[in-house]
Swiss-Prot record:
Changing H43A: Loss of catalytic activity. No effect on bactericidal activity. SMART domains: RNAse_Pc (SM00092). Keywords: Antibiotic, Antimicrobial, Disulfide bond, Endonuclease, Glycoprotein, Hydrolase, Nuclease, Secreted, Signal. Disulfide bonds join C51-C109, C65-C119, C83-C134, C90-C97. This is Ribonuclease 7. It comes from the Eukaryota. One of its GO terms (cellular component) is extracellular space. Its EC number is 3.1.27.-. It comes from Homo sapiens (Human). Residues 1-28 form the signal peptide. One of its GO terms (biological process) is innate immune response. Belongs to the pancreatic ribonuclease family. Residues 29-32, 139-140 are annotated as: Important for antibacterial activity.
Length: 156
């Protein structure tokens, strides 16, 4: 009976570790970074770049291949200005989202294959409106804006 129990404990520990790792969201903000700084890294790209190279900068922080990501080809100041449009409901029900005035150039990157750090993406360039969640800037953020984007809620 003892040998069966000895084999059970490592399996249980492995299962618990797997469940714990599965709970870490891919979009979790890296330590030492504000939500707005992480938003800039994940979604701001004034000049379009190929997804395979652009996503390396995101994936190096998360240590995994992010499934889907959208880059807005706008200056940060333009996206921050979106935070001044009327509030609308976010997908999660919060009321701190704001819709862009019009369509902007963007690139959607979708994971096709690979394991970190060799993630491969398919890209799709589009012109669409977007919705961002905004919050007051934190101490480490630029205080230039009353509200700053912290989450890309959806593309319309």
């Amino acid at each position: 009976m003892a040998p069966a129990r000895a084999g059970f404990c490592p399996l249980l520990l492995l299962l618990l570790l797997g469940l714990w790792v599965a709970e870490i969201p891919v979009s979790a903000k890296p330590k030492g970074m504000t939500s707005s700084q992480w938003f800039k890294i994940q979604h701001m790209q004034p000049s379009p770049q190929a997804c395979n190279s652009a996503m390396k900068n995101i994936n190096k922080h998360t240590k995994r291949c992010k499934d889907l990501n959208t880059f807005l080809h706008e200056p940060f100041s333009s996206v921050a200005a979106t935070c001044q449009t009327p509030k609308i409901a976010c997908k999660n029900g919060d009321k701190n989202c704001h819709q862009s005035h019009g369509a902007v150039s963007l690139t959607m990157c979708k994971l096709t294959s690979g394991k970190h750090p060799n993630c491969r993406y398919k890209e799709k360039r589009q012109n669409k409106s977007y919705v961002v969640a905004c919050k007051p800037p934190q101490k480490k953020d630029s205080q230039q804006f009353h509200l700053v984007p912290v989450h890309l809620d959806r593309v319309l």
